[in-house]
């Protein structure tokens, strides 16, 4: 195997592209191209540090690579994040690599922070701090949107010019509002989905896009993520923060373990007046999926659906972890069901979103044909909570079903081996791949 490990795979016709990080993760990586008919190596292209995800443009002319550029553990080396654009119009042998970087935004850190972009690595410039995670491309192959998860922002990329044209902050979700409730504690051994004075950063992992009435919409799985390194960590439990008495007169009650005390928060944001205590509280991820305009405006969010639906469907397993059965409520203090993967598919004129829940497992299905009138369809989870998730030797019990869905792929009926639309899930913890046939009633 080339380099230090394969992070992402994409296929266009007979060409397979694989993103491979270097043995030294902070060094530049590469993309290897293979012939799908015999898996022979066709060629390679050098890209940025830690290529985390790649995708072909719909027309197959380019491969776009999200170079995450994470720092090393002591934060002594923090490579720049970037997007590599590999031009394949003249074949792999003549592939030309250009880089859409964030250098033009260096020196604008305070402006970006004021707009809501989280730039907070110790001493980091914009280029060093932004970590491209996932890419979606417009149907016309001209524009890409790239999520920077920890920064809670999207980058807009002009593919032909290989230029980042905008950085769009995604804002926060107010969990004190009706419809945005969450369960914030893993120490009450109960389902308690309620309103709290907390704002959740959307922080998507996977994103996808679709076109309706000549408008592109971005769909995000709002997983959430923090920075937690030996050299720098932003994580703190709310009970360990000093809360402003004016903003939180009931701080002592809020900070009890059974209330907000256990919820993971950040030390980076929330001290709005710089006096050393916290005037606002933030959490990681929104426990939902969202639809955004191409300009980054929120069009739809699923609110508290995921926790409410899983609580009703699996009341004894609510907010379980993905490697242990009988772990009721164990993820409530972190990111709840943790939506991570997303795929979109068109069936009989309707656009459906399939969202994988990394922790409790399963897939949420919504009809998003009208982004302003989204309809919940169903929740499917084949996990067997009645057996041990792990065998005595530490391996996954093959009887447990799927654990930790991460990657999702929709196969339309026209390309399906059985002529029916299919959904494929890659499940990280169980190491399983599952194919679901989608039946429309």
Where are each of the predicted segments found?
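Beta-sheet-rich non-transmembrane sensory/scaffold domains
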Residues: 1-441
